[in-house]
Amino acid sequence: MAECVVHDWQGKEAGKASLELKVSKETTAVDLMHRAVLRQQAHSRQGTASTLTRAEVRGGGRKPYKQKGTGRARQGTIRTPLRPGGGIIFGPKPRTYNLAMNRKERRLALRTALMARLEDVIVVKDFGDSLKAPKTREISDALVRLGVAADAKVLIILSTPSEIIRRSVRNLEKVKLIAADQLNVFDLLHANSLVLSEEALAKIQEVYGDD
């Protein structure tokens, strides 16, 4: 079990919260998280790149010029890969890049990644509840009060982000906002600081604490 200090909106200590998740063995943790990140990045690829082979290029039924007497190399079709506009040899075709990974492994990788970043976790009580209208400055000032470096990549995890908070955060280049049910290994490992609401921490414990 790990304990986290809970801060209020002004950055002052407001209590403590605990998080207890089962993690991978130290010998396999890095490999497990690496495979989870590879799978996530592979699944984000569209796989729609496509080129025409010589069989698919239009035209080419007529011999471009006679066989002999021109001084040039013989050509039988304009669809040959040797000519500009001809077919492509071994070019890309639509395919899926998806990688298989067991559900238990995916959940274990997620729990391991979160617990590995526990030193960078900042838990906030009632995150942004005082905002009555979208204010980017309010969010950036709050992050400074919470001790987040100005140039840090920040991942904010809320139970159910409100539209006010979404609009307040979207103009901050290095700040990403996700819901607690959108947790993923890449975002957890990519960010320098993780800012969680108290409700999001409880939801994570509820969803991932039983395994």
From Swiss-Prot:
One of its GO terms (biological process) is translation. Keywords: Ribonucleoprotein, Ribosomal protein, RNA-binding, rRNA-binding. Transmembrane segments: none annotated. It holds the Pfam family Ribosomal_L4. Residues 41-53 have a biased composition (Polar residues). Residues 60-71 have a biased composition (Basic residues). InterPro entries: Ribosomal_uL4, Ribosomal_uL4-like, Ribosomal_uL4_dom_sf. Residues 41-78 are annotated as: Disordered. One of its GO terms (cellular component) is ribonucleoprotein complex. SUPFAM superfamilies: Ribosomal protein L4 (SSF52166). GO terms for molecular function: rRNA binding; structural constituent of ribosome. Part of the 50S ribosomal subunit. Belongs to the universal ribosomal protein uL4 family. One of the primary rRNA binding proteins, this protein initially binds near the 5'-end of the 23S rRNA. It is important during the early stages of 50S assembly. It makes multiple contacts with different domains of the 23S rRNA in the assembled 50S subunit and ribosome. Forms part of the polypeptide exit tunnel. HAMAP family: Ribosomal_uL4_B. This is Large ribosomal subunit protein uL4. It comes from Prochlorococcus marinus (strain MIT 9303). The lineage of its organism: Bacteria, Bacillati, Cyanobacteriota, Cyanophyceae, Synechococcales.
